């Protein structure tokens, strides 16, 4: 060992002195710095653990919110589908009702028109019958009032027809 110390040009006393100083420094560092450093490291470790736990908690909350939003979106889509289905059914009912009502009104209009046409026909026939009767009576009166030759009868009918046109 002496050889080692001689090669380094250190004396045994100096070496012991350095060792004592080093040990004292270690004790001082342990007493004054090691505690605060380990406390700081422990706080840092606890903070990292807390941050990891918080991140995991936030991830779970985000996943839960995403699931809730997805369920709400699914419910909204289902509700929209139901609303559209109901609206289509109501539109079909309204369409059928309007068509049925229009058909009924058209049938009523056709029936009224048919009745009006029949009434007009009846009125025209009655009026024509009345006119024919009046004409017949007028001709009979003229025939009775004078005895007519064929030419007179022809003139009488022509005059009567002219009288009708006027």
UniProtKB/Swiss-Prot annotation:
Entry-linked InterPro entries: ATP_synth_b/b'su_bac/chlpt, ATP_synth_F0_bsu_bac, ATP_synthase_B_chain
Residues annotated as transmembrane: 15-37
Membrane-topology descriptor: Single-pass membrane protein
UniProt similarity note: Belongs to the ATPase B chain family.
Function according to Swiss-Prot or TrEMBL: F(1)F(0) ATP synthase produces ATP from ADP in the presence of a proton or sodium gradient. F-type ATPases consist of two structural domains, F(1) containing the extramembraneous catalytic core and F(0) containing the membrane proton channel, linked together by a central stalk and a peripheral stalk. During catalysis, ATP synthesis in the catalytic domain of F(1) is coupled via a rotary mechanism of the central stalk subunits to proton translocation.
Subunit structure: F-type ATPases have 2 components, F(1) - the catalytic core - and F(0) - the membrane proton channel. F(1) has five subunits: alpha(3), beta(3), gamma(1), delta(1), epsilon(1). F(0) has three main subunits: a(1), b(2) and c(10-14). The alpha and beta chains form an alternating ring which encloses part of the gamma chain. F(1) is attached to F(0) by a central stalk formed by the gamma and epsilon chains, while a peripheral stalk is formed by the delta and b chains.
Descriptive protein name: ATP synthase subunit b
Gene assigned in the entry: atpF
């Amino acid at each position: 060992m002496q050889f080692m110390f001689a090669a380094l040009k250190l004396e045994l006393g100096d070496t012991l002195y350095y060792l004592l100083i080093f040990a004292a420094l270690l004790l001082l560092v342990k007493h004054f710095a090691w505690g605060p450093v380990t406390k700081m490291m422990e706080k840092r470790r606890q903070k990292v653990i807390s941050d990891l736990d918080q991140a995991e908690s936030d991830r779970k909350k985000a996943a839960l919110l995403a699931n809730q939003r997805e369920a709400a979106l699914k419910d909204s889509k289902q509700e929209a589908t139901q609303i559209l289905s109901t609206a289509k059914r109501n539109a079909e009912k309204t369409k059928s009702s309007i068509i049925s009502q229009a058909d009924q009104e058209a049938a009523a209009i056709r029936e009224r028109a048919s009745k009006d046409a029949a009434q007009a026909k009846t009125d025209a026939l009655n009026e024509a019958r009345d006119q024919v009767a009046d004409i017949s009576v007028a001709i009979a009166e003229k025939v009775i009032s004078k005895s007519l030759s064929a030419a007179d009868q022809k003139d009488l009918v022509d005059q009567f027809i002219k009288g009708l046109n006027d």
